[in-house]
Amino acid sequence: ITRDDAVKIRAEDGRSIEKVNISSFINNLPNNKDTYQFSTENASGSTSQAANVIEALEIGSKLLLIDEDTSATNFMIRDERMKKLVVKSKEPITPFIDKVRELYKEHGVSSIIVVGGSGDYFDVADRVIMMDEYIPKDVTEQAKKIASLDSKEQIEVGTFGSITKRVLLKSSLELTGKYTKIKPKE
């Protein structure tokens, strides 16, 4: 049970992308590849997930459903050590964690993110639910306390960025490919 405009977001290595403005997440690609009208026949995990987010916003979704198990790690997060090794000016990906609050503040888009390996999301979460033997428990207060004890320097990223209005072609939304669901034989 959820909103009727909720969209499941995942990485889809190898998918085709046609003229999607992924610049909110991806910039400064090699060979000056355009990210304001990004096109490829063979997207990486991070570019496909960025495109999936933007396409969901383009169709008016106000709720993104994300599971870290089906996400591109480098799209979702960059830890402090990696930020020190590869400085922002050399990294083309702005991770989702750095944009999720602005996405809500500027566009009213909420995100439900299932994570089991990244406590960094405690810093940006409004609510933290932990599954304890398949029973959901609100652990927001505990998570916020943990986050405050392990404070990190947040990098200012500015605004979320623009969402370009496009006309989606029906053929670009065909449900064929390696993720097509097949009914089992009975």
Tell me the role of every PLM-derived stretch.
Residues 2-41, 77-78:
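P-loop NTPase switch/communication element
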Residues 4-6, 61, 170:
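Active-site lining segments that contact anionic ligands and/or coordinate catalytic metals
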Residues 37-40, 46, 63:
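C-terminal amphipathic alpha-helical segment
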Residues 40-44, 87-90, 107-108:
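Short, flexible loop segments at the rims of nucleotide/cofactor-binding pockets, characterized by
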Residues 44-57:
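Conserved alpha-helical scaffold flanking the Walker A/P-loop in AAA+ ATPase domains
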Residues 56-100, 104-105, 117-142:
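Conserved P-loop NTPase nucleotide-binding/switch module
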Residues 110-113:
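Conserved H-loop
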Residues 127-186:
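Conserved P-loop NTPase
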